[in-house]
Curated annotation (Swiss-Prot):
GO MF annotation, one: oxidoreductase activity
Residues noted as binding FAD in the record, renumbered to the chain: A143, E162, N170, S171, G175, A176, A285, D352, H521, E550, A565
GO cellular component: cytoplasm; plasma membrane
Gene: urdA
UniProt keyword annotation of Isomerase present: no
Name by which UniProt lists this protein: Urocanate reductase
Induction conditions: By urocanate under anaerobic conditions.
Catalytic activity, as annotated: dihydrourocanate + A = urocanate + AH2
Enzyme class, broadest EC rank: oxidoreductase
Length: 582
């Protein structure tokens, strides 16, 4: 930890300090540093008469959306309570802890004794007991933002209510790659693709259990949705790079700047401010309001222990995501996915929208179809985005030093294959040549530090060293990689028929990561039509109620292909906003 101290105002002599003389109206500034999720967090704290009066963040590399909430709300709580013993932000615990530790170090550096105060309540404007909008959207992920912006564009008033203190949901913490057939990037790269092939891949990837019309609507509108993100929302995508996720026939997944959803959600937030789309955080939707005819006319929500009624003159859009973080719901619909499995999802993904809609007799379908993501942290369960090197040639190795599955297979296939290996884990191995193309280590330095600290990831110069750090039989690993290099040279993977072609791994340095599957996506959810209208248990439209994104249950079938979630949420989020605004 590094910190420094400066004193401004009345000079304090050594004698006065030793004697314990009290000096009033003294302003003290000091700095402190602590380790955040993606690098050091450095602050400068200003004290006066034993009180913290200001905290300035001098340096940080945290996720800009998560950091925004921490550096606003947690910082203010520290000032209000004159203490670092305050609650952090759910979903941003590491960043919250870093801020509090950095301020704590600055207190130590200043040598200031803070004045004890009664627990202060954060001053805030009185929250009205009710609001009225044309369209009320529940959830601030990609589907919710898309719906809200489209409602505003149609000339309607709209609001997004979000139960978490941070916007974005899983759309924020995902890689945010988006599959599109016929995108400008495919044209730049000379890749031939078609809507028909995209539809075929998606239906096959879900074992033909996905609804063909829902899939077709998603694919048909994908180009327009991506161009809307690029041109209207101002999301930056890499112009000359695409992912080919497992189950796809060609490279078709657009990659946002920074390789995470922070690029998308931050641009959504900026656009929402620009067009006057309010977002009410810490506001949990609890009940859908129906009139005498059965039409949905509003939402009852809770904020700081107070009930707030949101009247919706035209429609309510449910965009609350899935239930991967709700253990009881997971076990109810798929008992195998119990406490042994972590979750890649954010803490708020607990199925609230599904439960709320079922109470007014909305239909749900495919609830037992729950997907695991194959490459995640064995300690936290979080997805390992750094291992997206797999889409550029990284190989999967078991404890015996053998490959055991095609690296670009479907997520469910790879997950099951990993769980069948000794120890129920895999190693992901790649070299500098792959990193030069994938840039995953460069883009995910926070993960690199976290995985290295936990003993899950190493950078080594040779394959022999890679074998040694994880006690893999050296001779077997060398033999396996010799085969990989041969397959790369011939262009034919004789072992597992790698669909994109393997990459030569003869030159180091290498990165090797230990990983295991976690619950990732819930394919089941509310039954909707292609206009996103929610249907009841008799198959009839529930007037005034719409749903989009992971909360719905028809598009993906038994398994969602990588990169299809963002296509789904943006396409159907936009449709929901347009339909609700009519």
């Amino acid at each position: 930890m590094h910190y420094k101290k400066s004193i401004i105002g009345i000079a304090v002599t050594a004698t006065a300090i030793i004697a314990g003389c009290q000096v009033t109206h003294q302003i003290v500034k000091s700095q402190g540093t602590a380790q955040g999720k993606h690098g050091e967090v450095q602050v400068e704290t200003t004290f006066k008469d034993g009180h913290i009066v200001a905290i300035d963040v001098l340096k940080q590399k945290e996720n800009k959306v998560l950091a925004g909430a921490v550096f606003k709300d947690v910082k203010q709580a520290i000032i209000d309570n004159n203490s670092i013993e305050v609650d952090g932000i759910a979903g941003a615990t590491v960043t919250s802890k870093a801020l509090k530790e950095a301020v704590g170090k600055s207190i130590e550096a200043a040598g200031v004794t803070l004045v004890a105060t009664a627990s202060a309540k954060k001053s805030e404007a009185l929250t009205p007991a009710e609001y009225t909008y044309d369209v009320v959207i529940i959830g601030s992920g990609g589907a919710g933002f898309s719906a809200g912006l489209e409602a505003i564009a149609a000339g309607r008033s709209a609001v997004i209510i979000e139960k978490m203190p941070i916007i974005g949901g899983n759309s924020l913490i995902s890689g945010a790659e988006m599959n599109v057939a016929g995108s400008w990037v495919q044209k730049n790269m000379g890749i031939t693709d078609s809507k028909e092939l995209f539809i075929s891949d998606t239906l096959k990837g879900g074992d033909f259990k996905g609804d063909p019309e829902m899939v077709k609507t998603m694919v048909d509108n994908a180009v327009g949705a991506a161009e809307w993100l690029r041109d209207y929302v101002k999301v930056e995508f890499y112009p000359d790079q695409l992912f080919q996720f497992g189950g796809h026939s060609v490279k078709r997944a657009l990659i946002p700047k920074g390789h995470t959803g922070a690029e998308v959600i931050s641009k959504f937030s900026i656009k929402a401010d620009e067009v006057g789309l309010p977002i009410h955080t810490n506001t949990k939707a609890e009940k859908l309001i129906q009139d005498q005819t059965g039409r949905i006319v509003g939402v009852e929500a809770a904020h700081n222990g107070k009930t707030i009624t949101y009247h919706a003159k035209r429609g309510v859009v449910i965009a609350t995501g899935g239930f991967s973080s709700n253990m009881e719901m997971r076990k109810k619909y798929n008992p195998e996915l119990d406490e042994r499995y972590g979750s890649t999802g954010h803490a708020g993904g607990t199925g609230d929208g599904i439960v709320m809609a079922e109470k007014i007799h909305a239909a749900a379908k495919n609830m037992g179809y729950i997907q695991s993501y194959p490459i995640c942290s064995p300690t936290s369960g979080a997805i390992a985005l750094i291992a997206d090197s797999r889409f550029f040639g990284a190989v999967l190795i078991n404890q015996k030093g053998e490959r055991f599955v095609e690296e670009l297979e479907r997520r469910d296939v790879i997950s099951h294959a990993i769980l069948a290996q000794p120890g129920r884990y895999t190693y992901v191995l790649w070299n500098q040549d792959i990193e030069n193309v994938a840039h995953t280590v460069e883009m995910h330095q926070g993960e690199l530090k976290e995985f290295t600290k936990d003993g899950l990831m190493y950078k080594v110069d040779t394959l022999e060293e890679a074998a040694k750090v994880f006690n893999i039989p050296e001779d077997k690993l060398l033999s396996t990689i010799k085969d990989v290099n041969h397959y790369a040279a011939t262009g034919k993977d004789e072992a597992f028929n790698h669909r994109s072609g393997l990459v030569d791994l003869s030159k180091g340095p290498y990165w090797i990561l230990k990983a295991t599957p976690s619950v990732h996506h819930t394919m089941g959810g509310l039954v909707v039509d292609t206009r996103t209208r929610v249907l009841d248990e008799q198959g009839k439209v529930i007037p005034g109620l719409f749903a989009a994104g992971e909360v719905t249950g028809l598009t993906h079938g038994t398994n969602r292909l990588g990169g299809n979630a963002y296509t789904d949420i943006i396409v159907y989020g936009r449709i929901a906003g347009q339909e609700a605004a009519k």
